[in-house]
Design a protein with these regions (language model features):
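Juxtamembrane intracellular "pre-TM" segments in multi-pass secondary transporters
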Residues: 1-32, 217-219
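Alpha-helical segments in transporter systems
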Residues: 29-38, 156, 160
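Short helix-kink/termination motifs in transmembrane helices of multi-pass secondary transporters
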Residues: 30-31, 39-51
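A short structural micro-motif
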Residues: 38-39, 192
Length: 219
Protein backbone atom coordinates (compact mmCIF):
# COMPACT_ATOMS: atom_id res chain seq x y z
CA UNK A 1 0.00 0.00 0.00
CA UNK A 2 1.03 3.62 -0.55
CA UNK A 3 2.81 5.11 2.45
CA UNK A 4 3.09 8.89 2.24
CA UNK A 5 6.30 10.41 3.52
CA UNK A 6 5.66 13.56 5.47
CA UNK A 7 7.61 16.71 4.72
CA UNK A 8 9.50 18.33 7.55
CA UNK A 9 12.87 19.11 8.99
CA UNK A 10 15.78 16.72 8.75
CA UNK A 11 15.32 15.56 12.34
CA UNK A 12 11.64 14.88 11.76
CA UNK A 13 12.41 12.86 8.65
CA UNK A 14 15.06 10.91 10.52
CA UNK A 15 12.65 10.15 13.35
CA UNK A 16 10.04 9.03 10.81
CA UNK A 17 12.51 6.52 9.39
CA UNK A 18 13.41 5.40 12.91
CA UNK A 19 9.73 4.91 13.75
CA UNK A 20 9.20 2.88 10.59
CA UNK A 21 12.09 0.56 11.44
CA UNK A 22 11.10 0.29 15.10
CA UNK A 23 7.62 -0.93 14.14
CA UNK A 24 8.82 -3.55 11.68
CA UNK A 25 10.65 -6.60 12.97
CA UNK A 26 12.26 -7.53 9.65
CA UNK A 27 13.85 -4.15 9.00
CA UNK A 28 14.75 -3.64 12.65
CA UNK A 29 16.61 -6.95 12.53
CA UNK A 30 18.45 -6.03 9.34
CA UNK A 31 19.55 -2.71 10.82
CA UNK A 32 20.58 -4.53 14.01
CA UNK A 33 22.85 -6.82 12.00
CA UNK A 34 24.68 -3.79 10.61
CA UNK A 35 24.76 -2.10 14.02
CA UNK A 36 26.22 -5.12 15.81
CA UNK A 37 28.79 -5.48 13.05
CA UNK A 38 29.94 -1.89 13.50
CA UNK A 39 30.04 -1.92 17.29
CA UNK A 40 31.36 -5.43 17.94
CA UNK A 41 32.57 -6.91 14.65
CA UNK A 42 34.70 -4.58 12.55
CA UNK A 43 36.05 -2.88 15.68
CA UNK A 44 38.75 -5.58 15.53
CA UNK A 45 40.56 -3.37 12.99
CA UNK A 46 41.50 -1.01 15.83
CA UNK A 47 43.47 -3.79 17.51
CA UNK A 48 45.34 -5.13 14.48
CA UNK A 49 48.55 -3.21 15.32
CA UNK A 50 48.68 -5.04 18.66
CA UNK A 51 48.37 -8.40 16.93
CA UNK A 52 51.02 -7.55 14.35
CA UNK A 53 53.50 -6.15 16.86
CA UNK A 54 52.91 -7.96 20.15
CA UNK A 55 51.46 -11.34 19.21
CA UNK A 56 53.03 -12.05 15.83
CA UNK A 57 56.18 -9.89 16.10
CA UNK A 58 55.79 -8.95 12.44
CA UNK A 59 55.78 -5.17 12.73
CA UNK A 60 54.48 -2.90 9.99
CA UNK A 61 54.80 -5.62 7.36
CA UNK A 62 52.55 -7.93 9.32
CA UNK A 63 50.08 -5.13 9.94
CA UNK A 64 49.88 -4.48 6.21
CA UNK A 65 49.34 -8.16 5.49
CA UNK A 66 46.56 -8.43 8.05
CA UNK A 67 44.77 -5.44 6.55
CA UNK A 68 45.27 -6.75 3.04
CA UNK A 69 43.85 -10.14 4.01
CA UNK A 70 40.52 -8.58 4.94
CA UNK A 71 40.52 -6.59 1.70
CA UNK A 72 41.13 -9.67 -0.43
CA UNK A 73 38.32 -11.52 1.29
CA UNK A 74 35.97 -8.56 0.85
CA UNK A 75 36.74 -8.40 -2.87
CA UNK A 76 36.08 -12.12 -3.32
CA UNK A 77 32.89 -11.80 -1.28
CA UNK A 78 31.64 -8.97 -3.48
CA UNK A 79 32.33 -10.88 -6.68
CA UNK A 80 30.74 -14.02 -5.26
CA UNK A 81 27.48 -12.42 -4.14
CA UNK A 82 27.23 -10.55 -7.44
CA UNK A 83 27.56 -13.85 -9.29
CA UNK A 84 25.28 -16.12 -7.28
CA UNK A 85 22.78 -13.74 -5.63
CA UNK A 86 19.86 -14.78 -7.82
CA UNK A 87 20.65 -18.46 -7.38
CA UNK A 88 20.72 -18.59 -3.57
CA UNK A 89 17.95 -20.98 -2.54
CA UNK A 90 17.38 -19.53 0.95
CA UNK A 91 18.58 -15.91 0.97
CA UNK A 92 17.40 -15.10 4.50
CA UNK A 93 19.00 -18.16 6.03
CA UNK A 94 22.20 -17.61 4.04
CA UNK A 95 22.39 -14.00 5.21
CA UNK A 96 22.04 -14.91 8.88
CA UNK A 97 24.48 -17.80 8.62
CA UNK A 98 26.97 -15.43 7.01
CA UNK A 99 26.61 -13.06 9.95
CA UNK A 100 27.04 -15.90 12.43
CA UNK A 101 30.03 -17.13 10.45
CA UNK A 102 31.62 -13.69 10.69
CA UNK A 103 31.41 -13.80 14.47
CA UNK A 104 32.84 -17.31 14.65
CA UNK A 105 35.68 -16.39 12.30
CA UNK A 106 36.54 -13.36 14.42
CA UNK A 107 36.72 -15.63 17.45
CA UNK A 108 39.01 -17.94 15.49
CA UNK A 109 41.25 -15.06 14.46
CA UNK A 110 41.44 -13.79 18.04
CA UNK A 111 43.02 -17.04 19.17
CA UNK A 112 45.27 -17.55 16.15
CA UNK A 113 48.79 -18.39 17.33
CA UNK A 114 50.60 -17.32 14.15
CA UNK A 115 50.21 -15.24 11.00
CA UNK A 116 49.68 -18.49 9.11
CA UNK A 117 46.37 -18.87 10.97
CA UNK A 118 45.46 -15.19 11.25
CA UNK A 119 45.74 -14.29 7.56
CA UNK A 120 43.37 -17.01 6.23
CA UNK A 121 40.97 -16.22 9.08
CA UNK A 122 40.88 -12.55 8.09
CA UNK A 123 40.38 -13.43 4.43
CA UNK A 124 37.28 -15.36 5.48
CA UNK A 125 36.23 -12.52 7.80
CA UNK A 126 36.36 -10.10 4.88
CA UNK A 127 34.45 -12.54 2.69
CA UNK A 128 31.68 -13.17 5.23
CA UNK A 129 31.36 -9.51 6.13
CA UNK A 130 30.86 -8.33 2.56
CA UNK A 131 28.78 -11.34 1.56
CA UNK A 132 26.07 -10.87 4.17
CA UNK A 133 26.07 -7.06 4.41
CA UNK A 134 25.56 -6.79 0.66
CA UNK A 135 22.44 -8.88 1.12
CA UNK A 136 21.30 -6.71 4.04
CA UNK A 137 21.64 -3.58 1.92
CA UNK A 138 19.83 -5.22 -1.00
CA UNK A 139 16.87 -6.36 1.10
CA UNK A 140 16.52 -2.90 2.65
CA UNK A 141 16.55 -1.17 -0.72
CA UNK A 142 14.11 -3.63 -2.26
CA UNK A 143 11.72 -3.86 0.67
CA UNK A 144 11.36 -0.36 2.08
CA UNK A 145 8.59 1.74 0.46
CA UNK A 146 9.92 4.32 -1.98
CA UNK A 147 8.83 7.26 0.16
CA UNK A 148 10.84 6.05 3.15
CA UNK A 149 13.82 4.40 1.52
CA UNK A 150 16.16 7.35 1.98
CA UNK A 151 15.26 7.67 5.64
CA UNK A 152 15.86 3.99 6.37
CA UNK A 153 19.09 3.93 4.38
CA UNK A 154 20.27 6.88 6.46
CA UNK A 155 19.87 4.68 9.55
CA UNK A 156 21.84 1.94 7.81
CA UNK A 157 24.58 4.45 6.97
CA UNK A 158 24.56 5.75 10.54
CA UNK A 159 25.58 2.29 11.72
CA UNK A 160 28.87 2.67 9.84
CA UNK A 161 29.51 6.03 11.48
CA UNK A 162 29.48 4.23 14.83
CA UNK A 163 32.64 2.29 13.98
CA UNK A 164 34.80 4.64 16.12
CA UNK A 165 32.60 3.87 19.13
CA UNK A 166 33.10 0.17 18.49
CA UNK A 167 36.83 0.78 18.34
CA UNK A 168 36.65 2.64 21.65
CA UNK A 169 34.82 -0.26 23.28
CA UNK A 170 37.30 -2.79 21.89
CA UNK A 171 40.22 -0.67 23.01
CA UNK A 172 38.84 -0.31 26.53
CA UNK A 173 38.32 -4.06 26.83
CA UNK A 174 41.78 -4.73 25.42
CA UNK A 175 43.29 -2.37 27.99
CA UNK A 176 41.36 -4.05 30.80
CA UNK A 177 42.16 -7.63 29.72
CA UNK A 178 43.93 -8.06 26.39
CA UNK A 179 43.35 -7.66 22.65
CA UNK A 180 42.62 -11.33 22.05
CA UNK A 181 39.87 -11.30 24.65
CA UNK A 182 38.38 -8.10 23.21
CA UNK A 183 38.02 -9.56 19.71
CA UNK A 184 36.83 -12.88 21.12
CA UNK A 185 34.02 -11.10 22.95
CA UNK A 186 33.13 -8.98 19.93
CA UNK A 187 32.92 -12.03 17.70
CA UNK A 188 30.82 -13.87 20.27
CA UNK A 189 28.32 -10.99 20.42
CA UNK A 190 28.04 -10.83 16.62
CA UNK A 191 27.55 -14.60 16.36
CA UNK A 192 25.03 -14.73 19.22
CA UNK A 193 22.94 -11.94 17.70
CA UNK A 194 22.87 -13.66 14.30
CA UNK A 195 22.04 -17.07 15.76
CA UNK A 196 19.22 -15.55 17.81
CA UNK A 197 17.76 -13.92 14.69
CA UNK A 198 18.18 -17.20 12.83
CA UNK A 199 15.44 -18.66 15.03
CA UNK A 200 12.91 -16.33 13.38
CA UNK A 201 10.93 -17.91 10.55
CA UNK A 202 10.11 -14.43 9.23
CA UNK A 203 13.78 -13.61 8.77
CA UNK A 204 14.61 -16.98 7.28
CA UNK A 205 11.80 -16.39 4.77
CA UNK A 206 13.36 -13.19 3.41
CA UNK A 207 13.79 -13.64 -0.31
CA UNK A 208 10.93 -16.14 -0.53
CA UNK A 209 8.26 -13.73 0.67
CA UNK A 210 8.15 -10.10 -0.40
CA UNK A 211 9.60 -8.04 2.43
CA UNK A 212 6.89 -5.32 2.21
CA UNK A 213 4.31 -7.90 3.34
CA UNK A 214 6.12 -7.95 6.68
CA UNK A 215 5.59 -4.20 7.07
CA UNK A 216 2.08 -3.71 5.80
CA UNK A 217 0.87 -2.78 9.26
CA UNK A 218 2.91 0.41 9.39
CA UNK A 219 0.99 3.67 9.52
Amino acid sequence: SHIPARDGHVLGQFLEGLSFVAHNFVFASLIALALFNSLFGLSYVTLLPIFADCYFASGSTGFGLLNAAHGVGALVGTLTIATIATRIARPGTTLLMGAAGLGILLMTFSQGPTMAVAIPALVLVGFSNTFYLTQVSTFIQQGVPDQLRGRVLSLYSLCWNLLPIGGLLAGALAAAVDARFAILCGGAVVAANALLLLTSARLRAIGHVKVPSAVSGYS
